[in-house]
């Protein structure tokens, strides 16, 4: 970016602060960053959790990787540079949503550890919870809801994570969920995490 142009940009402070929004909402804001292979259950778990939050009057929003790539990041390929840019853009959007007082659920493969760490640093460690959906690739491939593994195996698509490209599992995720566990059990764990971090009041989903 042109330095002269950058020097003429000034951050506009909002009269309504994040703290005021959180107080009105009755809960704090945070990011749950769901990472895992395609077909691991990221979006399914995030959707199920969002339904619970919504029914309990908690303001949340789910950002799905495919949805973002269909609009905001439709100009990006799956090269390493573009994958990094994709994650950076998502991080910038999430940063604004944090200040809106929301609980943001991000479902995106984000295959590289440095990508996820970049977002953690961008948002601040206290605002970011890395949720690793640990599902064996054999199960992900057997599910294959979008038929992407099949296309990758036959060479119809390239640069597919888990086949042609590496997925780097988190060394120490904030939350570890088994993609083979039930939606209810995984959601209970996430609700407990949010409660233990003083983000929300306790929710009983039994």
From Swiss-Prot:
Its EC number is 2.7.1.25. It catalyses: adenosine 5'-phosphosulfate + ATP = 3'-phosphoadenylyl sulfate + ADP + H(+). ATP binds at residues 36-43. The active site is at 110 (phosphoserine intermediate). Pathway: Sulfur metabolism; hydrogen sulfide biosynthesis; sulfite from sulfate: step 2/3. One of its GO terms (biological process) is sulfate assimilation. Pfam families: APS_kinase. One of its GO terms (molecular function) is ATP binding. Keywords: ATP-binding, Kinase, Nucleotide-binding, Phosphoprotein, Transferase. InterPro entries: APS_kinase, P-loop_NTPase. Catalyzes the synthesis of activated sulfate. Belongs to the APS kinase family. PANTHER family: ADENYLYL-SULFATE KINASE 1, CHLOROPLASTIC (PTHR11055:SF63), BIFUNCTIONAL 3'-PHOSPHOADENOSINE 5'-PHOSPHOSULFATE SYNTHASE (PTHR11055). This is Adenylyl-sulfate kinase. It comes from Buchnera aphidicola subsp. Acyrthosiphon pisum (strain APS) (Acyrthosiphon pisum symbiotic bacterium).
